[in-house]
């Protein structure tokens, strides 16, 4: 208030930063492997079962430090579905990030088969298409840092754990750097 004798107030904040802002270490981008786990209900009639907020879960901080980019820069550099699904796509252009799925053989698939950025995934963790023996999926919203996992109702098995590997691939000066997020989906 203007009649307060301490006005104008002076405040100082320390030990804090903007939400999602990360202290980036010096050096070149590196690869990263990180993991998440979630318990899910195999009897659920809903397709989406859980959404990870990668920013709040600390995953984006790890990726930001590995790629040497702020989370907001990663979101802005993440390619749209139409670019990635284009015929002949083999990886992101310089300065760009593509979301893929690391298959059990180590190859990265960019053949999106779920809504937007995402994949229907076979029981062994390889990229597939809906209805062709696939039971689980993930979808990614780059702007919201939201990674949603789910299943085809009636297809997932109680007592089974499915492992999937959503992967962000960053191209820096022609070299591809991968952030592999291994997710264990435990169905009860």
Model-derived features: positions:
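Solvent-exposed, low-complexity, repeat-rich "mucin-like" stalks and linkers
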Residues: 6-129, 183-188
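Extracellular/luminal low-complexity segments enriched in Ser/Thr/Pro
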Residues: 1, 140-160
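Extracellular/luminal ectodomains and secreted, surface-exposed scaffolds of diverse proteins
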Residues: 115-117, 131-142
């Amino acid at each position: 208030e203007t009649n307060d004798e301490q006005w104008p107030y002076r405040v100082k904040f320390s030990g804090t930063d903007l939400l999602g802002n990360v202290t980036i270490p010096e050096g070149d981008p590196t690869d990263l492997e990180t993991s998440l786990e979630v318990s899910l209900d195999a009897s659920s009639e809903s397709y989406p079962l859980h959404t990870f907020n990668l920013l709040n879960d600390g995953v984006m901080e790890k990726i930001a430090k590995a790629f040497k980019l702020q989370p907001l820069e990663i979101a802005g550099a993440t390619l749209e579905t139409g670019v990635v699904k284009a015929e002949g796509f083999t990886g992101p252009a310089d300065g760009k990030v593509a979301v893929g799925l690391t298959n059990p053989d180590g190859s990265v698939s960019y053949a999106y088969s779920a809504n937007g950025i995402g994949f229907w995934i076979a029981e062994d963790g390889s990229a597939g298409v809906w209805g062709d023996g696939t039971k689980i999926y993930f979808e990614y919203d780059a702007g919201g840092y939201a990674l949603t996992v789910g299943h085809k109702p009636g297809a997932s098995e109680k007592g089974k754990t499915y492992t999937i590997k959503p992967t962000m691939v960053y191209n820096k000066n022609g070299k591809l750097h991968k952030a592999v997020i291994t997710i264990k989906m435990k169905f009860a």
